[in-house]
Every structure is written in structure tokens, then in C-alpha cells.
Swiss-Prot record:
Name the UniProt record assigns to this protein: Ninein homolog
Keywords recorded for this protein, A-Z: Cytoplasm, Cytoskeleton, Developmental protein, Phosphoprotein
Result of knocking out the encoding gene: Viable and fertile. However, one report found that hatching rate is severely decreased in mutants, likely resulting from most embryos exhibiting varying severities of mitotic defects, such as excessive nuclear fallout, abnormal nuclear aggregates, bridges between chromosomes, chromosome segregation defects, delocalization of the centrosome from the mitotic spindle, and in some cases failure of cellularization, monopolar and tripolar spindles. Moderate reduction in survival to adulthood and a small decrease in larval motility.
Entry-annotated residues carrying Phosphothreonine: 144
Subcellular location: Cytoplasm, Cytoskeleton, Microtubule organizing center, Centrosome; Cytoplasm, Cytoskeleton, Microtubule organizing center; Cytoplasm, Perinuclear region; Cytoplasm
Region Sufficient for binding to microtubules, residue ranges: 1-361
Domain of life: Eukaryota
Subunit note: Interacts with ens.
Job of this protein: Required for the positioning and anchorage of the microtubule minus-ends in various cells. In fat body cells, part of perinuclear non-centrosomal microtubule-organizing centers (ncMTOCs) which function to accommodate the organization of microtubule (MT) networks to control nuclear positioning and dynein motor-based retrograde endosomal trafficking. Within the ncMTOCs, Msp300 and shot anchors the ncMTOC at the nuclear surface and recruits the MT minus-end regulators Patronin and Nin for assembly, anchoring and/or stabilization of circumferential and radial MTs at the ncMTOC.
Gene: Nin
Segments of skewed composition (Basic and acidic residues): 527-537, 547-563, 616-634
Keyword DNA damage: no
Gene Ontology cellular component list: centrosome; pericentriolar material; perinuclear region of cytoplasm
Region of interest (Sufficient for interaction with ens), residue spans: 487-526
Length: 1091
């Protein structure tokens, strides 16, 4: 920072530098230290208060200097405008013998009599003067310090010589203290004179005093009084001729000769010549009188003695006239001072009245403010009590609803347990039948083996001779063997189907057990949530706590059903050529039994399928209830909270990594700078040695000036303006997006109002109608809360990829995972939180979720990511132009990452809106990339300069080695070329030193600027994240209130239907009674007319 040549400002800057902690900035502690060093009043509390509100990051030297000047100016104004200081000036030609005369106790004009003050008055006087404004007496004089200084200068100009002693005595006014001692002057000789300041100084004092700050009424009165006093004394004072002390002590020769001629003294010039005053133009009166007295003593003649006496008398007459003039002037000045003093007393009285009125108004205002604050406090207390009561009612209603939900859940649990027991009994019956069938099959197999063995033995006994082996029995045996093989294959297939059926039954049992476990867990979790909510209600009724727990959506068991199938062994019997008809009949009967068992198994399978369909229908029916909807909303909320926490953790880790990298680079840079400084100091020492050795002759070469730094500064300013404009555009787009979201929320409310009829008729729907409604709801855009939130683009998460990367230095990629729960091809763009990110070391990877066109097009470039995040959304299809633009942006990001050693993140891939929203971050990234390149170029230049400096050091070492030879050579002859070379080297060294200092300063400023921008952007990110969290909380609250309204409407509708049914029943009863009465009337009317 440039500091002026003022030594006081330089000293202040040195003190500022000694106290600073940051780079040119002061925090609160360093400000207190600097104020204590400057010895300010109250340690500069007012100065720190003026600086603390507007500068949160720190205070620079310029800001501190301006604030200090304002503080000192206010202090000086307060001191000068506090009141007039009454002083009296006594100016004498010689030192005076002053005596103090005790004045009697008198009633002062400005004295306020002490009274008993009732109440507490904080400001100014405690009572008002009893006398009137125009009944005040006149004091000596009321002068300020400036008037006294001017009077001293005028007195010095009046005296005109330094030999005379000037005495200026200041005393308080006579009316300030009762019984004060007045300063009197005792004149020992007639030549001593007491005078006051000249009239022009008094006029200036009047003009200064009347310019003081007063109220409008007092100012008008003061102006009238000053005009009257000036009109009274201007004529008498201005008519006088001012007489100086020189005129009193000296007189001209011409005036002496005229006075003597009027006194009829002959030969005046000869007389002056005799007295010794012939050649002088002005004569001292005392010396002339002394000379005349000496002449009178020495003269004997009467005539000459009379002439001398007449001359002496004429001199005394002129001196007496001068004294009269001086006395008249003093008298007029005294009158003028008394009038001024009287006017000043009147002004003081007016000011006292104004001060009392002002302080009375201040007290009234303070009382009114206190009353307003008390009223506001009472209203605030009322509002808080009302809120407390409302919150208590709300939470009591919530607890009642939760208890009803618990009762319904317990009933569902009982129903499911009964169904589970029935299924278990059926399963045990099926297992017993299956075991019986298996035993029968094994027995048949054993009988078949025995029969085969017997057939083989009979065939061997019969076919022992080849002569009795006809062809027909062989063919018949071959056919039998083929049929046997087919039967065996069928048996094996039946055994496999039996094993599969067992596996399915085992899986069904496991699923039933898992459902039971899930019910138990949900019940325990509901109880825990009730306990937590009760504790939260006790702690704070109006604040919502942040829950960090596993969402209910993750309570599903992910256990795979174990393979519970049993390995079956199939024994193949030996084939035989012969068979028996009885055995074949037994086998046919067994086949019929197995077929019947297969039919039973198929019927059981159908039964299981029907049960599964009923379970699905029951689940879908339960999902349509508002309780399940609220549960889904709670799960989505917890997922969003978890995603937000993951995002915060991710960015914190990123920031910590960036800070560590920045600190490492700064340490490396400081080490290099330290080494370069050491080398530079050594070089400077050697250059000084050479300067001492050789003389400095020759002219300096011109320094090369370059305008690169100015151009770079102008470019940086232009880029900063662009960044500001882009940030303004982005804020406008965010405001538009918020308005669109609000309109969509209103649409959702309307849809919820239309869906009341569907919810009221849900109790009368069958399983098929429930399935159809669920399918239609799956197709609709607002079928589930998660799909609706996806449509509103409120759910978003920069999920971390779970794939292990080879390079641990680069962080895991940020994913935009696809697949919303309601529909896969949702056509809406989401604004991810990573769009506002600035520094990121993760490359961008696109996720492949479903058959979306963006992912299918980029399947070759990017690998498929692992499983989707708990909350995900598919991307929209985009035009080829937009896709090309997004690919170009990704390529730019990749090139910038390879050049600067860091990769910047870019999520602007999907549509024009997201591209416009990401314009400011991309501009920031380009600017940071360019600054990084510029920093690298500066480092290269510094390295080049350090190499040049090392070369110069080597040259200087060589010159030192050649020093004795050069000394001998210079002793013989002179070498101007070496001298010029040395001068050039010195100039070059100085130029290099200046360049290095400039570059160091510029790099430091760049680093500070980038760090400040980084901090500002981090704060902006935090604020945006907080606003988004608040918006999400508001939306969830609105959705919960909408769900509660739907529930209330459903309950009311059910009550209304019940009342309608009851009324219809009553109407039917009334109609029946009416019909019966009519019939009775008809019967009663027919009896008397009978024959």
C-alpha cells in the first residue's frame, strides 16, 4: 500500500503493521491493541464500534485512517463547542506588580442556586435560572483560545520591539465563582499603560461567537442583540484615530519644530542641533526631555532659560495630548468590551434555556420509548403463550392419531399371525403327504430292483443254450427295456419337481418369517419414534430436530432365501431282457398314484399363487391408505436428510483437502522465497563490496518499462464485471424457478382436493379394482410422494460412486443416478447441489439408468456405475446440439484438469436451463484456471530470474578470484570498459531486484484475492444450502398438512355415509309403519259395512 510522505502518517502505518495479524488487515484484538498504543480515550471504543459493523473480514489501513480522522474530528468539535471560555487579557509595556484584591461575595449572573431535584435527570442542568434574560450583569470579557492568540499577535505588532516585556494573563470570569479574586494592576509611574486588544480582533471574535450552533429561536435573538450593540458603538469607535506605543514614545522632528514655533521659540533647528537631534527624523521624547533638562541646568541667562522652559512645556503638551487620545481610545474599547460581555451573557442564558428544553424533550421521548417497549413486550408474551397453547393442542392431537395408528397396526399384526399359522398347518400337511409319497416310491423302486434281478436270473437259466433263443422274446424284452427307461426318466422328473416344490415351500416359510420380523421391527421403531417425539415435545414445542437414523425404507431384509432343497439319489437298476405282467400292473398303479399326486401339487401351486396375489392386493390396498402415504413421505424426508448430510460431509472433506494442498503449496513457496532471499542478500553484499572498491562514474541506463501488469489488471477487472453480471442472472433464474415451484405446489393441492372422492370410495373396492387403481396411479405423475418430489425437482443428491478407483489422489466421481420410483422416463430437469460447487477434484461420470437416450448415447464413453442411490431421478432426453455443447464443456473441464493438476466439476449436461444456471460456476472455473496458468507462468519467470541471479553470483565469484590481477592492472592503466560493465551489472541487479519485488507483491495480492473469493463463495454455498433446506422443510410441512386434511376429509366422508345409511333405514322404517297404519285403517273401515 502506498503511504504519503507525511512522517506522522508513516509512523501510524508502522504501528498498524506491528499490530496486524492477517495480510494487511486487523481483527478486533489487533484493533484494541492499536488503540491502546495510540492512547485513545476509552481505548477507542467509539472507533471500534464504527469499524466493527461494516468490516467483518478485517480493517485495512485506509479504512482505519479515515475512521481515526472522523473520531478525532468529532472529539475536537465536542471540545470546542462545549462552551465559551471566559478569559481576560492584561497587556503592559513592562512587567507589572499585580495584587489580588478579594471581592465581596456577590450574586453571579450565571450561577444556578442549588435546589432539591425530584426524580432523576440524566442530561444538562438540573434547574433553570431565576432571573430574566435582560437582567444579567456584565462580566469582564469572554474570549476563546483563537481570539487570545490573535490578540497576542496584535500586541506584538503594536509594541514593535522585543525588548519590552509582554505579559498575557488569563483569569476566569468574575461571575464564574462567587467571591473570586480579581486581578488588579497598580501603576507605579505615569508612563505605564494598561491596554486591551484592538477593535478588529474583537469584531472577529464577535463574528466567530455568533456562528456557534444554537436553536432557531435563540439564534434570532442573538442576531438582534449583536446588531444593536454594533450599531451603538460603531460610530464612536470608528471616529477615533488609533494611537500606537511608538507615537507615545517618539515624535517627528517636524512636529517638534512646529510646536516650538507656535511657542515663539526662535532658531528651533539650531536648538535641536545643540541638543544633538539634528540628523534624525524621529526623536525619543524621554531622551529629548533629559537633554533639555541638562541644558537648563547648564544655562545661566534668563532669556535662554525661558526659551528652554517653553520648549520643554511644548513637548510635555504634545505628550499629554497623545496620552489623552490613548485614554479616550481605551475608554471606548472598554465600553465596547462591556457591551460584548453583556450580549454574551444574554446568549449564554438563551443557550441554557434551549438546553433545558432539549433535555426535557429527550426525557419525554425516552419515557415514550420505554412505554412502547413495555407494550411490545406484553404483546410478545401474549403471542408466545398463544403459540404454546396451540402447540400443546397440536401435539396432543398428534399423539392421539399415533395411538390410533398403533392400534390398527396391532390388529393387522394379529391378522397376519393367524394367516401365518394357517399357512404353516397347510405346509405341514403337504410335507407329510410328500413324505408318504416318497416312501411309496422307494418301496416301488426296491420291488422293481428285485423283479429285475429275478428276471435276469430266469433269462440266464432259460437262455443258456443258443439254440432255444428265438427272436420275438428278444424284441419284446427290448421294448420292455425302452418302456422301463421312459418310466425311470419320468420318475426322475417327478422327483426333481418334488424337490423344487419343497424349495418353494421353504422359501415361502422364510418369507413369512421375514414379514413377521419386519412387523416386529416396525412396531419397535414406532414405539421408539413415539418416545423420541414425546421427548422432543417436552424439550421444545416449536423447533424441529434433525434426525440421524436409518430410514424405514432400509429396514427391508435383503437376505437371500437359502437353498433348502435336498439332494436326491437315484439308483438305476440293472436292465433285464425279460419282464413280468404282474410287475407291469403294479407299476401302472404306481404311475396313476403319482399322477394324482402331481394334480394335487398343481392345485396347491395354484392355491399358493392365489395367496400371493391376495397378499399383493392387500399390500397395494394398504399403500393407498393415507397412513402408508405419510410413511412414504417420512421415508423420503429421512432419505433427503441423509443425502444432505452426505453432501455436507463430502464438501467438508473436499474443502479440507483443498486447504491442505494450499498450505503445502504455500510452504513450498515460502521455502523457495526464503532461499531466494538468502541468495539475494549474499549477492547484495558482494555488490556492495564491489561498489566500495570501484567508483561510481557514468550515466545510468534507462529502465525497460512493460505494460503487461496493467493489461492483466484491466482484464481481471473485466472478468470480475462479467462474473457479477452472470451471478445476477443466476439469481434471477433462481427466483423464476421458485415461482414455478410455487405454482406447481398449488397444482398439487388442487389434485389432492380432486382425489378425495377416490379415497372415500376406496373401502368398497375389490382386489381387482385396487390393482387397476394402483396401475393407473403408477402411470400418473403424482402417484407417490417420491415421484411427486422428483417432478418438483426437490430431491437431489450428488451421490458418491462406490467403485474403487486406482488413483486414490483423485476423489470418487459424483453421480446423477437415474430411475425414479414412479416412471422411468420423467421429463424434468433437476438442479443438483454440485452445480454451485467451485473447487472439486472429482471427474464427472454419467450413470446408466434404464434405457434413457442420454445414457445409451454415452455408454461407450463412460462405464456403468454400481447400484442406484436411495433417491434418484432419470435424465431427460436432450437435443443433439445440447448434447454436443455438454460434451464440449466436459472436454474443456478435462483439459483444464490436466493442465492445472485439478479437475473441476461440471453438471450442466441436460438442458438449456441447467446450462444457464451453471454459467457462473463455469466462468468462475475458467477464471481460476486462467489464474492458475498465470501463477505457473509467474513461477517460471521467478525460476528464470533465480537462474540469472545464480549466473551473476558466479560472475561475481570469478571477478573476486581475478581481483588481484585487476588491481595490478588498474594500478598501471585505467580500463573504462570494465567500469562500464560494472555499472551495467549494478543497474541490472537493481532492475532485477525491483522486478522480483513487484512480482512478489503481485503474487501475494493474487493469492489474497483468490482466497477471499474462495471464502465468499463458500459462504454463498452454505447460505444456498440452508435456503434449500428451509424450502424442503416448508414443502414437507405443507405435504403433511395436506395429508392430514385428506385424512380428516376421509373420516368426515365416512361419518356422512354412515349418517346417510342410517337416515335411509329410518325412512324405510317410517314407510313400513305408514303402510301398516293405512292397512289397519282400511281393515277398520271395512268392518261396519259387513252384512
Amino acid at each position: 500500500m502506498e503511504v504519503s510522505a507525511d512522517p506522522y502518517e508513516q509512523k501510524l502505518y508502522q504501528m498498524f503493521r506491528s499490530c496486524e495479524t492477517q495480510c494487511g488487515l486487523l481483527d478486533e484484538k489487533s484493533l484494541l491493541k492499536l488503540c491502546s498504543l495510540l492512547e485513545l480515550r476509552d481505548q477507542g471504543s467509539a472507533l471500534i464500534a464504527s469499524l466493527g459493523g461494516s468490516h467483518q473480514l478485517g480493517v485495512s489501513f485506509g479504512q482505519f485512517k479515515e475512521a481515526l480522522l472522523n473520531f478525532l474530528g468529532s472529539e475536537f468539535d465536542g471540545n470546542t463547542s462545549s462552551g465559551f471560555i471566559e478569559r481576560s487579557l492584561v497587556i503592559t509595556d513592562e512587567p507589572l506588580n499585580n495584587t489580588y484584591i478579594e471581592s465581596p461575595p456577590e450574586s453571579s449572573d450565571r450561577e444556578v442556586s442549588p435546589k432539591l431535584v425530584v426524580g432523576t435527570k440524566k442530561y444538562g442542568r438540573r434547574s433553570r435560572p431565576q432571573q430574566g434574560i435582560y437582567e444579567l450583569s456584565v462580566t469582564d470579557s469572554d474570549n476563546t483560545d483563537e481570539d487570545q492568540l490573535q490578540q497576542q499577535q496584535n500586541q506584538r505588532s503594536l509594541n514593535g520591539c522585543d525588548e519590552l516585556g509582554v505579559q498575557v494573563q488569563r483569569s476566569s470570569s468574575q461571575s464564574d465563582l462567587p467571591g473570586s479574586r480579581r486581578l488588579r494592576s497598580v501603576h507605579t509611574s505615569g508612563s505605564k499603560l494598561k491596554r486591551c486588544a484592538s477593535l478588529p480582533a474583537r469584531r472577529k471574535m464577535n463574528s466567530n461567537t455568533t456562528g456557534a450552533t444554537t436553536s432557531p429561536t435563540a439564534a434570532a435573538k442573538l442576531k438582534q442583540l449583536s446588531i444593536q450593540s454594533q450599531a451603538q458603538h460603531s460610530s464612536s469607535v470608528e471616529s477615533l484615530d488609533t494611537v500606537t506605543p511608538q507615537q507615545l514614545e517618539t515624535i517627528s522632528v517636524h512636529s517638534i519644530m512646529e510646536a516650538w514655533e507656535l511657542a515663539s521659540i526662535p532658531n528651533t533647528r539650531n536648538l535641536l542641533h545643540v541638543l544633538g537631534f539634528d540628523e534624525e527624523e524621529e526623536v525619543n521624547l524621554q531622551q529629548l526631555t533629559k537633554a533639555l533638562e541638562e541644558e537648563l541646568r547648564g544655562i545661566d541667562g534668563d532669556h535662554e532659560q525661558s526659551n528652554m522652559l517653553r520648549a520643554l512645556a511644548a513637548l510635555q503638551a504634545t505628550e499629554l495630548g497623545n496620552y489623552r487620545l490613548a485614554y479616550r481610545q481605551q475608554h471606548e474599547e472598554n465600553l465596547k468590551l462591556r457591551a460584548d460581555n453583556k450580549a454574551a451573557n444574554q446568549r449564554v442564558a438563551l443557550l441554557a434555556v434551549e438546553v433545558d428544553e432539549r433535555h426535557a424533550s429527550l426525557e419525554d421521548n425516552s419515557k415514550k420509548q420505554v412505554q412502547q417497549l413495555e407494550q411490545r413486550h406484553a404483546s410478545m408474551v401474549r403471542e408466545i403463550t398463544l403459540r404454546m397453547t396451540n402447540d400443546r393442542d397440536h401435539w396432543t392431537s398428534m399423539t392421539g392419531k399415533l395411538e390410533a395408528q398403533l392400534k390398527s397396526l396391532e390388529q393387522e399384526e394379529i391378522r397376519l399371525r393367524t394367516e401365518l399359522e394357517l399357512v404353516r398347518t397347510e405346509n405341514t400337511e403337504l410335507e407329510s403327504e410328500q413324505q408318504k409319497a416318497h416312501i411309496q416310491i422307494t418301496e416301488l423302486l426296491e420291488q422293481n430292483i428285485k423283479l429285475n434281478q429275478e428276471l435276469a436270473q430266469t433269462s440266464s437259466s432259460i437262455g443258456g443254450t443258443p439254440e432255444h433263443s428265438p427272436l420275438r422274446p428278444r424284441r419284446h424284452s427290448e421294448d420292455k427295456e425302452e418302456e422301463m427307461l421312459q418310466l425311470m426318466e419320468k420318475l426322475a422328473a417327478l422327483q426333481m419337481e418334488n424337490a423344487q416344490l419343497r424349495d418353494k415351500t421353504d422359501e415361502l416359510t422364510i418369507e413369512i418369517e421375514s414379514l413377521n420380523v419386519e412387523l416386529i421391527r416396525s412396531k419397535t421403531k414406532a414405539k421408539k419414534q413415539e418416545k423420541q417425539e414425546k421427548q422432543e415435545d417436552q424439550e421444545s414445542a416449536a423447533t424441529a430436530t434433525k434426525r440421524r437414523g436409518d430410514s424405514p425404507s432400509k429396514t427391508h431384509l435383503t437376505e437371500e432365501s437359502p437353498r433348502l432343497g435336498k439332494q436326491r439319489k437315484c439308483t438305476e437298476g440293472e436292465q433285464s431282457d425279460a419282464s413280468n405282467s404282474g410287475d407291469w400292473l403294479a407299476l401302472n398303479s404306481e404311475l396313476q398314484r403319482s399322477q394324482s399326486q402331481d394334480e394335487e401339487l398343481t392345485s396347491l401351486r395354484q392355491r399358493v399363487a392365489e395367496l400371493e396375489e391376495e397378499l399383493k392386493a392387500a399390500k397395494e390396498g394398504r399403500s393407498l391408505t393415507p397412513e402408508s402415504r405419510s410413511k412414504e413421505l417420512e421415508t423420503s424426508l429421512e432419505q433427503m436428510q441423509r443425502a444432505y448430510e452426505d453432501c455436507e460431509d463430502y464438501w467438508q472433506t473436499k474443502l479440507s483437502e483443498e486447504r491442505q494442498l494450499f498450505e503445502k503449496e504455500r510452504q513450498i513457496y515460502e521455502d523457495e522465497q526464503h532461499e531466494s532471499d538468502k541468495k539475494f542478500t549474499e549477492l547484495m553484499e558482494k555488490v556492495r563490496e564491489y561498489e566500495e572498491q570501484f567508483s561510481k562514474d557514468g550515466r545510468l541506463s534507462p529502465i525497460d518499462e512493460r505494460d503487461m501488469l496493467e493489461q492483466q489488471y484491466s482484464e481481471l477487472e473485466a472478468e470480475a464485471a462479467q462474473l457479477r453480471s452472470s451471478s445476477i442472472q443466476m439469481l434471477e433464474e433462481k427466483a423464476q424457478e421458485i415461482s414455478s415451484l410455487q405454482s406447481e405446489i398449488e397444482d398439487l393441492r388442487q389434485r389432492l382436493g380432486e382425489s378425495v372422492e377416490i379415497l372415500t370410495g376406496a373401502c368398497e373396492l375389490t382386489s381387482e379394482s385396487v390393482a387397476q387403481l394402483s396401475a393407473e396411479a403408477g402411470k400418473s405423475p403424482a402417484s407417490s410422494p417420491i415421484s411427486y418430489l422428483w417432478l418438483q425437482s426437490t430431491i437431489q443428491e450428488p451421490a458418491k460412486s462406490l467403485a474403487d478407483s486406482k488413483d486414490e489422489a483423485t476423489a470418487s466421481a459424483i453421480e446423477l443416478l437415474g430411475g425414479s420410483p414412479s416412471h422411468k422416463t420423467a421429463s424434468r430437469n433437476n438442479l443438483t447441489t454440485s452445480e454451485t460447487s467451485i473447487f472439486s477434484t472429482t471427474p464427472f461420470e454419467s450413470s446408466q439408468s434404464g434405457p434413457s437416450p442420454t445414457n445409451s448415447g454415452n455408454s461407450n464413453a463412460y462405464g456403468a456405475n454400481p447400484g442406484p442411490a436411495p433417491i434418484s431421478k432419470p435424465k431427460r432426453s436432450q437435443s443433439p446440439q445440447q448434447a454436443a455443447a455438454s460434451e464440449g464443456e466436459i472436454a474443456d473441464c478435462e483439459t483444464s484438469s490436466t493442465a492445472s493438476g485439478k479437475s473441476f466439476e461440471s453438471n450442466s449436461k441436460t438442458s438449456c436451463l441447467s446450462h444457464e444456471k451453471c454459467s457462473s460456476p463455469s466462468a468462475l472455473k475458467e477464471e481460476l484456471k486462467r489464474l492458475k496458468f498465470f501463477e505457473l507462468s509467474l513461477k517460471e519467470q521467478i525460476k528464470d530470474l533465480s537462474l540469472q541471479r545464480d549466473g551473476l553470483v558466479m560472475e561475481l565469484q570469478q571477478l573476486q578470484e581475478a581481483r588481484p590481477v585487476l588491481e595490478k592492472a588498474y594500478a598501471r592503466t585505467t580500463h573504462p570498459t570494465l567500469q562500464q560493465r560494472l555499472n551495467q551489472l549494478e543497474l541490472r541487479n537493481r532492475h532485477l531486484q525491483n522486478v522480483i519485488k513487484q512480482q512478489q507483491h503481485y503474487t501475494e495480492s493474487l493469492m489474497q484475492q483468490s482466497w477471499r473469493q474462495h471464502q465468499v463463495e463458500l459462504n454463498d454455498l452454505h447460505s444456498r444450502i440452508e435456503t434449500q433446506g428451509v424450502l424442503l422443510a416448508d414443502q414437507t410441512q405443507r405435504l403433511q398438512s395436506a395429508d392430514i386434511l385428506v385424512k380428516d376429509l376421509y373420516v368426515e366422508n365416512s361419518h356422512l355415509t354412515a349418517t346417510v345409511q342410517r337416515l335411509e333405514q329410518q325412512r324405510a322404517r317410517v314407510n313400513l309403519i305408514h303402510q301398516q297404519q293405512q292397512q289397519q285403517r282400511l281393515v277398520g273401515g271395512g268392518l261396519p259395512g259387513m252384512p
